[in-house]
Amino acid sequence: RNSCYTSSYRQPVSLVVEWVLIGGLAMQDKLHEIRVFENFQEELFETGHVIVTTEVVEKSLNYFGNAHGGYLFTLCDQVAGLVALSTGDYAVTLQSNINYLKAGHLSDQLKIEGLCVHNGKTTKLVEVLITNQEEKILTRATFTMYVTGSISE
């Protein structure tokens, strides 16, 4: 057991971590390794604009057979970092937000496109879209990147 507080009411909340049987299978049987950028292609790398493509593989699916949300988020986060690099700076994710709009499926061809909409000295704001081969938007994400140094230094 672990105690934590909710942010709004400061009431203690108990968290219990234990293996739960679901349909006769332990929860650990539902967990598996997720692969990201196993087969990516850099399509565009310009100042403030990056496009990477990849294919959804079996190792990137969730239990329901769709592209795992963590997989999609990681694709966005990696591209946001590449966008920061494209502006000449090293940066780390300071804050992020993602909206999942449609499911990705096995063998979908994904385009991950990042665009720097604010190129500041200490922070950058990067918008990232993931679209499929039908040009349907799967995710829309925003990343605030904190600049840790210049590539030229």
Regions found by a protein language model. Name each.
Residues 2-5, 9:
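Intrinsic-disorder-associated, low-complexity terminal segments enriched in Asp/Asn/His/Tyr and depleted
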Residues 5, 14-153:
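Terminal targeting signals and extreme-terminal segments of soluble enzymes
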